Amino acid sequence: MGNSYAGQLKSARFEEALHNSIEASLRSSGGDPQPVFTQLYLEPDQYSGHVEDIKPKMDLSLRSDPSTHVLVKCHSSNSVEDMDDEDDSDTSSPPLPYLQGPPPDGCCTVDGFCQAGKDLRLVSMATESIEVPAGFELVGAKSPSIPEHILVCAVDKRFLPDENGKNALLGFSGNCVGCGEKGFRYFTEFSNHINLKLSTQPKKQKHLKYYLVKNSQGALCKGALICWKDCKTRPFSNSASSSKPSSSSSLSSKENGDTNGHSPSPFPLSDSPPARMQSGSSSGIFGPQELGFLKPLNTPTHGTKTLPIVPTALRVNGLTNGLSMDGRSTLLSPPRTNPLSTPSHGYRTTETGDSPASTAMSTGPPKKRHRSWHPTTLVPIPATAVPVPAIRPLTCSSGPLLSLSNQQPASVSGVIQPQPITAGETVIIPDNLLNSYGVRPVLLIGQGTLPYFFGNVGDLVVSPLLVSCYKGRELNEKTLASLGMSANQLLTTETMILLTLQYLARLGTEQIPLREEFEQIMLKAMLCGPTGPPVSPAQLPWLARMEASVSGGSVQVLVTHGSLGEGISESLRSLSETSPQQQQCLPNYVLIICTSKSGANEFCVLVLGKYQSRALAESMLSTNEFLKEISYELITGKVSVLASHFQSTSLGDNMDKQLVRYQRKRKDRVVQPFQGHLTEYIHSQEAATMIPESGPDLLSDDFQIHPPQLSVARSLLSQVCAIADSGSQSLDLGRFCKVDFLILVPPSHVLVHQTVQRIRQSGVLIDLGIEDVSLAMQKSDKYVVRLDTEVHTKMEAFMRKVKQNPYTLFVLIHDNSHVDLTSALSGSVCHGELQGLADRVVNCPEVLEAINLLVLQVSCFPFTLQSRQSRISTQNEVHWPDTENQQGEASPKDLIYFGLKDYSKSLQWGVASPILRCDDAFERMVKTLLERHPHLHSMVIRSYLLIQQYTEALMALTAAPSLRDHVTPQTLAMVEDLLSVPGRSKHGCGHMLLVRVPSLQLARLAQERLEEARDKLGLQYRFAVLLGSPAAEISLPVHFCARLRAWRGCKNEEWVPHTYEDLEGLPCIVILTGKDPLGETFPRSLKYCDLRLIDSSYLTRTALEQEVGLACSYVTRRVIPKTKTATSREERPREGERSSGETAEHDDLPMELERPPSNASAATRTSGSTTENGVSSSSILDKPSSQSDPCGSRTMMDSCSSPVRFKQECDSQAPSSSSTSSFSSASSSSSSSSSPAAQRPSQSTQAPRECNRTQVFPRTAVLSRAAYTLLAPETLGHPSSASLLPHADVSWSSPLRPPVPHGLGGAEQSLYYRQWTTARQHHADYEGPVPHPHPRRLLLSGPPQVGKTGAYLQFLRILFRMLIRLLEVDVYDEEELEEDVQDKSKVPPSSGPQWPDVEDVRKLRFDLCPHDCKFKYSSPVYANRMPKTQSGVKTERLDTEADPPKRNTVSVRLSLFAAHNAFHHCEQCHHYSEPIPAAQLSDCTFHAFTFCSSMLGEEVQLHFIIPKSKESHFVFSQQGSHLESMRLPLLSDKESGMMKSPIFTPTTGRQEHGLLNIYHAMEGAEHLHILVVKQYEMPLYRKYWPNHILLVLPAMFNNSGVGAARFMIKELSYHNLELERNRQEEQGVKRQDVWPFIVMMDDSCVLWNAQQPGPDGKTEVMNVSLKSVLQHMEATPKISQYAVCGLRKWSSSLSSQAPTSPFSRCHLHDLILLNVDLTQNVQYDLNRFTCEEVDFNLRANSSGLLLCRFNQFSIMKKHIPIGGHKDFLIKPKLMRIETPVRVCASQYVCAPDSEQTLLAAPAQFLLEKFLQSCSHRLFPLALSNSANPVLSIDSYLNLGPEVQVCYVSSRPHSVNVDHQGVIFSGLLLYLCDSFVVSSLLKKFNFLKGATLCVICQDRSSLRQTIVRLELEDEWQFRLRDEFQTANCSEDRPLYFLTGRHI
């Protein structure tokens, strides 16, 4: 209940209450403790101080001779937090919120408001009328989050103290005055409701501060303080310091949820409702305590809950079972504050004069259901726990040293029963271990029961580092199977002990145990299996000692027989008794083995080595925790001794005095800023005004994207398309016409400026069309948002845009997304950083649910995004191509990426000065200082030493050469480079030196000290010292800004650098601070990365590698030794990447030439999406893609980018141009390359004016020993950084797992981490949707500084281009073949009437030859007067064995009136394309329609599928079941907007791609649209077009061509016309008044245009709707006299041509208005596959019918490569081999009954294809002979473009061409009917040797036709001239006979 205070209970009343409480708990049905003690009042009387007044139930077991008691003074239980001071929170470090359960969904969480959203602040409630129930009072509560406000609460008076601080009932009862909710019985519940957001456990004493009263004006105001205790009589401990942060007595650790500053979530114990407590959990750890001992507890083994913070005396018994599998260490230190407050995880030492017990008792027990403690209480300590023998192996004895045996405590739900404590299991930690011996021992948990620890617990650290390695028996069968093991391969305890010894023995003196390394040892041992008989418990001691003997004394074995506590106690006692001289002989590790009589061995490891114990303890702290610890040490002055040490130089002189002396000596003179030696001084005023010449030659300002970036961008685009095509309907690309974006970056000002600069340089805002050219530069910053406190406002605005623009595809790019992945529920202010913001933004419901929003997370260390709970699908990951595989073919001059792997491999180069270095001299200094200052964190010591090293190096190089020998050579070399290089150049360019100092306080200290030393030494104009803090802008002195401006030729005096790249060439030291590097790019002048502060605190892969990632860059290929490149070439064939093919394509191009920007439209035609290098789509104007200056006056960008830098479009720095010794030529340009080889730098590289380019060398990284060991090659025997835990926010999902395979690509690594890691509780993905990742989220991963920003900006660009392409369509753009010029003079002018005159049209001559370009390779039709181009002969021939010729297309933008395919979706026409649920398919009705076809000579049955909504277009029988007819309007109907003609669309194979959605084309008007489909395709069309009427052809037409569909449409339409005439005639309508027209339209008609005369004499073309076109034609006067009306085909040349006649008589196709009445006797050839329209038009014309084309209208046809009436795949009927064999055209026919391979294709199709390609063999005399065409009776067949056909109809009274005087070269009789007679044929003249070809259905018909037509009289036949199509008999082949004219 947590409401106790300074008053004390009488012991008798307390015991009675305790008894009642336990009894109530035991009797209750639930396992939770019941709220009791409300009958007790606290009495503040001074306690008597006698131990006898405390009556513990176990005192009898502890009572012995009083002389053996050790009396210890205990401090007051009233900790600092109980003081009345309002500001009683810790001032040295920001508090962590007291972690409660998450608030209910949808509730208000704003400070000052209750969860119902009502304002509780006193300033708002002061004048409100508040109803206060009887017995309640208004009080004011203070919230740590808003200290300036008081919250108004109503509390029951009974639970408030009186004026004396007495008589307050324990517990709580309160009401919310905001929303009126009543009955809060627990203060925890109430504090949650009013959003107190506490940093400690909720206590009414701490947070209810004031009574509230009304003033004279009646306003509510603050009254008197609530007197919770009698402050006058309460003594305070002298050792209690208010400046101390919360104690470290926590079981929290990184492995138990306490990472990155997240303290474990303690179970609610105070004022908490029982329902919130975990039954059977460790919440009972704060049960009744007796004499300072905590009872043993059993912790549940599930390991998913974080452990609570433990009180003073700790039993770690349950710890071994309660930790998570890979639990990290537990840090124990003396608790000086409330045990439930947040631990700082620092090292707390006992103050002078404190006894061990006083340290242990300073806090007292938790204040709930416990006996009160008093500062004067004397507590006895059992004598049996004190005398411990020295460290030595214990020999076998008759029994345990202590008579009491181990007892496992019984845990009672919620309340732990008081039990006697076994004295033998108690370990007293000696005093002052850390102070006296410089060691804080670390206890590595093994197996077994650990003892109670009592005394100076702050000097012992309990770590579960290796405990997961011993949990092999907990593996399930599935995990064992994945490891290739079975249960019988698990190791015994004895084997694990021996393996532990072997591992510890081989560790170096500067190595610490690594869990991942030891886990692999254990796994290998299991896989290898036992090599001999198992080790018995009796053999274990001597085998263990033998194993330890090889360690040289670093490992010792201690064997006990009672308990592990004996061995631990003995080891600690021995340590405390060791003299300082003997400390060097202490072992580093003591393995304690307990061999009990039961035969079960227990063991643990005590780490006593000074380095090892310290490194292990520090590695347990998360980054936030150790930064907080450093802050504490700096604030409290613990570093004063260390600081005083460094006030002197290494020679013993006072450093400050020495610097002052040097300053006075030089007076006002300073070292010359540049172009001068360090010994050359000038006056300071002159130095301040020295401006260098303009920098080295400027590079061109072109912006380029390089092949790897383009490859990645395309991969991202492909993945987006895959999401859209996945069928999950999570992304519909067809609805978007724009792209917008927002980039989220970590809270770094420099990173924001850097990203904004990339956006400006890339021109992406202009390319996306979201900003004007004039405003794009100024508005770029709107698209980049820092994840800080202002992100919510900007995200709200962004999400409003997302909701308001549903047809814009938004992309939310989360750059460097691995930096903060803390859950918003556990996010907190830690070390000044607000965490959880990314989770609130990226994972908020609005973002997850927005269907027009893509989330792209970008990371160079994506491991934490790839756990089992990842929100990103593995398919949605895009990984950077492997750089090694792209380097084999590149030129030595090219720049190649040099990354983390390359740094590790560089150690094999064998060079004298490696680029990856460890400063051994510095490490030796650090080791000495660490031993002198054991209380301080090692980073503090390293930082102070580093500052001194740089200071002394500056002094040694200028004024004190004697200090040279005291500075490490590495430091001296870096500083010498920094100082000397500017002096060698007239420009003053120099190096950048990057020093990484994670702690902000230490970084500021370093900046101050180095600036002070620099200025006093006169170097303030030589180099700059900058603090690189994420929270601040770059601050640079004025004279350095002037130097940068001079280099850039920048005239803007207000310009200052905003990014680190802007510091290009500036000699400077950048002290980079902050918890993590945030992705900032550094200039190529960065030469050194000093990472010597990155040590054993960075033991996760991400933490370590992101630090070394600062050094990664692009380097010149030739500077890399051949070992690297040779390896690359060897590995290249083995591992192929998707972009490897781009290398050879450009190998021969010159390396020094710039590639011109490519034309965007050309790129669109080739790649369909993007330009290659000229990334800006503005390059379609053939302009360079360089960005222009909006002011028109700058050379570079307005940011004054460096003249010698690469123009960068990505997150990579321009590679360092500085080599180890080559910067003496500072004016030379950096290496650049415009080669398009596959491996390109991520920067845009431009060719400099000079050709002698400086080589770009890798940067030098100087590491600590710990980091160097992990990054060195594994040949050194150490694990690599890749084997570490990938990130602190995830944990291993299994104690054992296979090792991380070497050389894994990004995808394989992702799969590994997804299988073997799981998110921790505070991770944003902790409750992620494992089975269903977010469908619209992608991950882009790539190495640091490789160019990811440029890649995703290019992705945005090509995504937009693709969306535009989706709104564009490729239409055929072909000019008509030459028309008959002689007729053009006779046509009316273009300004003629809108509609044709029937008589005028009759006067026009029908143009027999088809002019559409799709008939380019068809036979020309002979006419009386041939066009000029056709009077000659066509020479082209279509080779059917080759691919069909590509027709010209052009991309046009879809208009509002376009027809669409099934992928189109919009709100207006969704009923056209969106599939309906299966349950609604029954809404469609099936109807059979039967009629008799005179052409077929039999009845035909068609099937209609009619949706319910379309039934109004049909007439059904009275019963409603029989379809009678389709309704037709009347010719006289004048209703506006009415469409009279039903539209038939024959379609096949295009259920998705056919343009069957004509809703927009018809302007949404009512119309009748019928799809004519084959029977086997009906289900597919029904699925995609459920609301369309389907006309299903009979099954006999499944293999027929389009001619059959057109034939059936016309036959059905005429039969329906007759039915409608009969039906309407009964209603009094004349038969001739029924509308006789139908529309027959192809499924590829997309747009319609109308031509109008333009002002300049040219015609203007505008888009119109299909509705307007049809209505115009339907309104034609005397329309019933026209047989067919149609449109012309569009081409781009129409607008430029001179106006022609408005109407023509010619061939019509694609879209026709057909009069089925007039054309009753003119049929489509149902057998035809091709040219059926030409054949029909010739028949209709020969019948004397009118065909009229409206030339003012044109139709655009989309190029659809899929489906349609395309060629069949001709293949052999029986395939003997799998590989398809191409069949040549001559094999389409064969001799009857031959053995030739028969083909699986329709006979008619084979015939048409044969005639098309082989007619030159059939009719050799007609070849290229237009004067002697081939005579074709009643049919038009395509005989190829070289053979001309003369069409003649055999029908009586037909209109035929005048053939008088024409001698024909051949005769073609195709399925001729009875109208063809011998007398007709005798009218025609043929050349001698002319060819006859007679084609019939079968052989008998063929012979009968020969006889009937008397062909043998004039034609000679041979038996071998008979052929058939190459079909088998069941496929009904066609037969034909050829003959020669006699």
Curated annotation (Swiss-Prot):
Ranges in a coiled coil: none
Record region (Disordered): 76-101, 235-306, 325-373, 1123-1256
Compositionally skewed regions (Polar residues) per UniProt: 338-362, 1172-1202
Main location: membrane
PANTHER family assigned to the protein according to its UniProt record, in alphabetical order: GREB1-LIKE PROTEIN, GREB1-RELATED
Similarity field: Belongs to the GREB1 family.
Protein's UniProt name: GREB1-like protein
Protein's gene: greb1l
